[in-house]
């Protein structure tokens, strides 16, 4: 799909939701903020899953709580509704610049 005009169209394009681990090498990023792509591109710096929750299992994605933990210690917690750019807007935005296919991860 391409050029999704609304959040409703974006929702139609979503299969489900999963967890991700998105790492950034801050030492690389501090050297030059333009190195964001390099700072995120090392082997093992992105993983997802292992579970995908289908969209019909989530009544309101904005009510999901996101918690970052390491060895049982909570580092951050917040709700999807407080994200700077929420999931439906992300899907709509990316559809303006690339064709989205079934199975794509955003």
Predicted segment positions?
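Catalytic-pocket segment enriched in acidic/His residues
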Residues: 8, 26-106
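N-terminal accessory regions of nucleic-acid-interacting proteins
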Residues: 4-17, 28
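Catalytic and substrate-binding clefts that recognize carbohydrates or anionic sugar/phosphate headgroups
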Residues: 1
């Amino acid at each position: 799909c391409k050029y999704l005009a609304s959040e409703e169209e974006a929702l139609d394009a979503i299969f489900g939701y999963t967890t991700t681990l998105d790492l950034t090498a801050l030492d690389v990023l501090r050297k030059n903020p333009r190195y964001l792509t390099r700072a995120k591109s090392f082997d093992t710096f992105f993983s997802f899953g292992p579970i995908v929750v289908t969209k019909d299992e989530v009544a309101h994605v904005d009510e999901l709580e996101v918690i970052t933990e390491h060895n049982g210690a909570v580092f951050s917690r917040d709700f999807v509704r407080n994200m700077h750019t929420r999931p439906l807007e992300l899907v709509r935005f990316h559809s303006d610049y690339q064709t989205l296919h079934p199975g794509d991860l955003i």
